[in-house]
Amino acid sequence: MALSASLLITLCCLGTAHAQDRPAHDPTVVAPPAPTPTRYSIDASLDPATHTVEGTLRLHWVNESAAPANDLWLHLYLNAFASDDTVFMRESRGQLRGVQQAGRGGIDITALDTASGVNLLPGARTDLIRGDATQMRVLLPAPIATGDAIDLLIRFRSRLPPVFARSGYVRDFHMVAQWFPKLARREPDGTWASFPYHGMGEFYSDFASYDLALSVPEGWVVGATGAQTAEEHRDGRAIRHFHADRVHDAAWVAWPHFRERFLTHEGVQVRILFPPGHEDAIARHERALREGLTRFGRAFGPYPYPTLTVVLPPRGADGAAGMEYPTLIVSAGPWLNVPGVHSPVPDDVTAHELAHEWFYGLVASNEVAWPMLDEGITQWATSRLLADVYGDARSAVSLPGLTLDGFEAQRLFSMRGRPIPAAGLPAYAFDDSTYGRSVYLRTALVLETTRRTYGAARFDRALGLYARAQRFRHPTPEDLFSSFDGVFGAAFSERVLRPALLRGETADARLLRMSSVSNHAGGYVTDIEAQRDGTVALPLWIELRTASGVRRRLPWAPGLPRFRASFTAREQFVSALLDPDRHDLLDRNALDGVISEHPAPPRAVLARLVALFHALVAAVGA
């Protein structure tokens, strides 16, 4: 999910690294598993006058865990909008990304039967948390043994809220998401990974096949998870059928005014749905989609589905924008296209949501327990893509005479305000002022610092191995760390990734003093001293410069908390610059890495000051 279509997205979904080409045949791609035994078959009918969906779900579930199942747990996410007392409403204070709630929504289960006709509703409970009915525990008449299955028939009625948090409607536009009773994921040990709908963080469920039959008024355009397989017309209604294999959610959108554009790239049929009158703006989204399918596919393994639907919602539907679903993404405006002026919105939103098709879609981590594994890695991947497309210095903002490096912008933005919690915490440990800066930006900065410091080739290999090994699986941070340790060495994650991500430690370092004085023998004695204030110890360089531009670099080993050097040379050095190549994006104050005895500050220092000025300009103008 993207943060917003304003300053935060402008500073977030940006970057300064380059993808490396891989051969078309990549032997490290893990073969896809057999189709999942869990099946959802849903018949649904939208009433646009009441903004309700009447649905019938036929669910086939196989217990693949190691323990018998005595109950089932269902997510009833739409009940998050039923009152002000739900967990979501209490934690979010009735808003998401600046869009305020303006009405209620919910889901009612009207029938819950086994295939043999046993009514399970009397044994179903939703009063598991005070004021919240986003989970349902269903007691079973008999345990389901490992390897055995159950078939359920569930009838439900979903009441969509005015859209402000992903799902809902505005006028006749309907984003139908988190809309049906969905099984929680049952972990291999037999525990149910069930949780309420939180104000921060998103979702987690198991892979399944989905068959959707979606009924809308005649003439309405529908986009949905999966590929359309059939279409019927009767009684003034259109019924469109969609099918998807090995996905862990299904969502759809319906609006009578959509325009359509199609393209095929990397073997994927892409369908773009957009408001009328904005045809000229679609080119930027198309470029982001083409570049993303190619570059993400090379880096993380090919996109495996035959279709991808991209929705650009109309004005007023900002609450639905910037969200990912399997094989369906919702991007955002604005729609102004000014020649010669690059601002990454809206194509950064498209790129971000496309990256989620890998990190959330294929690598299906728990978005509530470890949001850094989807939002953080997606943030970094998007930044990398935009740098490849627009160039390092243009990846955030590019106006005539004004450019801004994306990762530097993220570093500056992440440091503002009160200190942020560690990125590796669960989603509910954050509020709306810290979630983006920590989960999105901090994670991206840790990854980019690792890449710059230890080498792009090895970094790309480590993250690529993680993405491929965990495809169609449900990884934890330990799986990510294991992939990096396999490439960088057994203790790498303990030295760098764990302290930076799980404990929120920094790589702060500063120059303490520098002098370069004549020895009265035709040379100069130069003394330099620096100190680490952070506990993430990175290998660094200190660059000394003369007034005429001669440079000398001194290495600072990661095991040394303090740096001291004294040497004699023919040149007099007048300035020192710590980390001249800007590898360390975990240093909260890059300006204390400069010492100058020359009246004109070094060019690199000016560059840092200009970058700060650009960020302030962006903040004022947002």
Q: What are these model-derived regions, one by one?
A:
Residues 319-322, 375, 379-445, 449, ...:
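Acidic/His/Gly-enriched intrinsically disordered linker/tail segments
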Residues 302-304, 393, 434-522, 526:
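Amphipathic alpha-helical substructures
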Residues 84-99, 157-210, 266, 583-621:
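Glycine/proline-rich low-complexity spacer/linker segments in large multi-domain proteins
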Residues 18-54, 170, 494-499:
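N-terminal, polar/Ser/Thr-rich
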Residues 62, 95-172, 560-573, 582-583:
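A surface-exposed beta-strand-loop module
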Residues 224, 493, 507-510, 516-581:
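Beta-strand-rich binding/interaction modules
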Residues 332-403, 463:
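Zinc-dependent metallopeptidase catalytic helix centered on the HExxH motif
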Residues 183-192, 198-351, 380-383, 392:
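Hydrophobic helix-coil surface modules that form long, contiguous segments used
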